[in-house]
């Protein structure tokens, strides 16, 4: 039996949760979880390393690497195959923006 998934910290919810190509079949959507979205945001948009991203999300570096690889595969599939991408769900908790919990990279 697998271990229960640990809650990952994210710095905010995405403003846009659906991306739909003009001729996409909406029944065949790809689901990108919030932690996958956050790994893409932190590493590709903010320029963090895997180690820095792991620290912000409060998970191990190997976990971040797995999350990031899965997210990149899903993004590639959505772009190449012209499929709808839906962002949401997953075991996450929002950064509280309190001094003891602040990550320094909050979106808002």
Language-model-derived ranges and their functions:
Residues 3, 7, 93-108:
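Helix-turn-helix/homeodomain-like alpha-helical modules used for DNA recognition
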Residues 49, 58-63:
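Helix-turn-helix DNA-binding motif, specifically the short coil turn and the N-cap/start of the second
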Residues 2-3, 8-34:
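Short, Lys/Arg-enriched anionic-surface-contact patches
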Residues 55:
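Alpha-helical residues within the helix-turn-helix
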Residues 43-46:
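Short helix-to-turn junction characteristic of helix-turn-helix DNA-binding domains
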Residues 67-70:
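Residues within the DNA-recognition helix of helix-turn-helix
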Residues 72-79:
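C-terminal flanking helix
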Residues 36-40:
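Short alpha-helical "packing" element that flanks the helix-turn-helix/winged-helix DNA-binding module
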